């Protein structure tokens, strides 16, 4: 088993990876660093007093306690579906013994974490990655790559992670599949210049599972002309379920480069998660933007990670983020116009959600 000191250093490394911190803007970076500092202090002091042995029982106890002290959505999920973390402990504790195999333990612990219903909660071992994906898998997709090919055709343009073209009714269409695909200011200048004479813009982020928050913010900054309140953030201040800081306002600064003032529709579905969910939340706060599609997948907690005595990694939501009205978006954002893909439309090669967005922009 690693020493307490090396365990602490490992936690600091996992909580504050340099590359991840570099991707956040100043406000998010400060908030996340404060969150990490508090969590390192709390968790390392806990290790000094209650370090668990590297046994199935010890790893189970360590996992339950990490989540108990640092997870950020207990109260919200108790309200939403009756989550009781102490009851979860009792339920799964009886399934753990020091005679079970490593893979049996992994299954039990993954099932326990699934009680949180959080796509940002994972258990990582060398042979598997425990996850909860029901937030998207239990719902219809409301997106079709075959329909995308019909609308983009074969002569679409590509600017880094964005595919784009002008539709037949002079409406710009951008398909952005993942915020893990970087976009530069030059990319955005070229795309918006290309659409300069268009009557409106459709940004399709359906099934975008997230990525780098800075990409989401860089894109959103092209749609505001002044510093705009887009949300709030908190961090844990102690190990209790209700130990949180005051809400800290998060603002979107306008880009100093080319900006868009015409109507915008953002297309969403259940596959919109994490940084993509945050993009939808930011855009939802803007007056010229309409969200069209189905409720997003959520994932509004900034994730942190710790290691267990056996070396497994556990990731969890640590810092809650809210929309501009101080509402939770952990379980998704309801669009302004809610609808599914219509089966009859799909058979005809028509994307119901894109067509609805076109009508919104045309004022129909």
Tell what function each PLM region has.
Residues 335-364:
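Low-complexity, Gly/Ser/Thr/Pro-rich intrinsically disordered linker/tail segments
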Residues 1-53:
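Bacterial Sec-dependent N-terminal signal peptides
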Residues 45-235, 242-248, 313:
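Flexible, low-complexity junctional segments that flank or bridge functional domains
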Residues 276-294:
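Cyclophilin-type peptidyl-prolyl cis-trans isomerase
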Residues 212-263, 301-305, 318, 322, ...:
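Gly/Ser/Thr-rich loop/hinge elements
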Residues 198-202, 259-265, 285-287:
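Short, surface-exposed connector motifs at secondary-structure boundaries
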Residues 175-179, 204-208, 233-236, 266-271, ...:
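Active-site-proximal beta-strand/loop segments in catalytic clefts of secreted hydrolases
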